[in-house]
Curated annotation (Swiss-Prot):
Function, as annotated: Catalyzes the reduction of the glycolytic intermediate dihydroxyacetone phosphate (DHAP) to sn-glycerol 3-phosphate (G3P), the key precursor for phospholipid synthesis.
Stated family: Belongs to the NAD-dependent glycerol-3-phosphate dehydrogenase family.
Source organism superkingdom: Bacteria
Binding residue positions for sn-glycerol 3-phosphate: K113, G142, T144, K198, D251, S261, R262, N263
Subcellular location: Cytoplasm
GO molecular function: glycerol-3-phosphate dehydrogenase [NAD(P)+] activity; NAD binding
EC number in record: 1.1.1.94
Record InterPro entries: 6-PGluconate_DH-like_C_sf, 6PGD_dom2, G3P_DH_NAD-dep, G3P_DH_NAD-dep_C, G3P_DH_NAD-dep_N, NAD(P)-bd_dom_sf
GO biological process, one term: glycerol-3-phosphate biosynthetic process
Name of the protein described by the UniProt record: Glycerol-3-phosphate dehydrogenase [NAD(P)+]
Length: 344
């Protein structure tokens, strides 16, 4: 028997992992009719039967207005607002699958955090390249753990778009006075760079805690990590204000200090002496920072941006550098003046 979906409001979410499911639950609980699609038909069928994502968000029931769909063409057939929440390494592939079925008036909301593998391109640029320059695009990012969002706990994020009319419209659609606050921004570059670099700094902060360096060291890494994030973003065309907001400082603090963060947990295990593959297996889910650090390091070299925490973390992950040696390399750097305006 086919399911008859409501025509409005029209939000389709691509990606039935923890974050995509959490957003779907939050939006449907806040009064929207939401369609959730995932690439694994068996997984979607389980969600339909259980009315819960037991694999990622156990114990959190789906609201009645959250619909599940196995067919991509059907999921896109009534879609006006399309929110994409898939890992960055498959983002381009997913867009290629979406393209033949997209309606001409579809607006894209990118919830994925990361860069295109090997090229280091921003996901917004990947979307423009595949779907065309005229498609309306917004990016959402900020301090959001999936489980807290799905539970209805208060959450605030940033929505960025070059199109201020689109930004205002989507802000009104997604915002909920009860528990989901949306701030608008026009710096799409900054919001994307922040969402990538914060995962790398979280791995570094986790390594520090795993070694046992304590709160002083963690706070220093967060603060200097914010400088690295800002340096890279500004070199690419972002504005400093973005990194002082929810998508920058907010998400950085959350990811570096709370053990719900996969990247932080991964770093802690490395600091405790676990081999990389054992730490990955222990965390059990995709660790975006592990993959994206290659592209971030590549961008830092390309744009001649000094990112010592990123560099040392990269050497730990991909050049077999000992975690203690990496820590000493950071501490032994030449002394310098701290000047935030100049991002020294």
């Amino acid at each position: 028997m086919s399911i008859k979906y409501p025509k409005y409001p029209n939000i389709t979410i691509i990606g039935a992992g923890s974050y995509g499911t959490a957003i779907a639950i939050a939006l449907s609980r806040n009064g929207h009719s939401v369609l959730l699609w995932g690439h694994n038909a068996i997984h979607i069928q389980k969600l339909q039967i259980n009315r819960c994502n037991q694999a990622y968000l156990p114990g959190i029931a789906f609201p009645p207005s959250l619909y599940l769909e196995k067919s991509l063409s059907i999921a896109l057939s009534t879609c006006r607002n399309l929110l994409i929440a898939v890992p960055s390494r498959v983002f381009g592939h997913v867009l290629m699958r979406l393209k033949p079925n997209l309606k001409s008036n579809t607006r894209i909301i990118i919830a994925s955090k990361g860069l295109e593998p090997k090229t280091g391109r921003l996901l917004q640029d990947v979307a423009y390249d595949i779907l065309g320059k005229n498609i309306p695009i917004a990016i959402i990012s900020g301090p959001t753990f999936a489980r807290e969002l799905a539970m209805g706990l208060p959450t605030a994020i940033t929505l960025a778009s070059n199109d201020t009319i689109l930004s205002c419209d989507l802000q009104n659609i997604l915002h909920c006075n009860k528990n989901f606050r949306i701030y608008s921004n026009t710096d799409t570059i900054g919001i994307q760079i922040a969402g990538v670099v914060k995962n790398i700094i979280a791995i570094g902060a986790g390594i520090s805690d795993g070694i046992g360096f304590g709160s002083n060291a963690r706070t220093a890494l967060i603060t200097r990590g914010l400088v690295e994030m800002s340096r890279l973003g500004i070199a690419i065309g972002a504005t400093l204000d973005t990194f002082m907001g929810l998508a920058g400082l907010g998400d950085l603090i959350l990811t570096c200090t709370d053990n719900q963060s996969r990247n932080r947990r991964f770093g802690i295990l490395l600091g405790q002496g676990f081999e990389i593959h054992h730490a990955q297996k222990n965390v059990g889910k995709i660790i975006e920072g592990f993959y994206n650090i290659k592209e971030v390091y590549m961008l830092s070299v390309k744009h001649k941006v000094d990112m010592p925490i990123t560099e040392q973390t990269y050497q730990i992950l991909y050049q077999n550098k000992n975690v203690h040696d990496a820590a000493h390399s950071l501490l032994e750097r030449t002394q310098k003046e701290e000047k935030i305006n100049g991002l020294k």
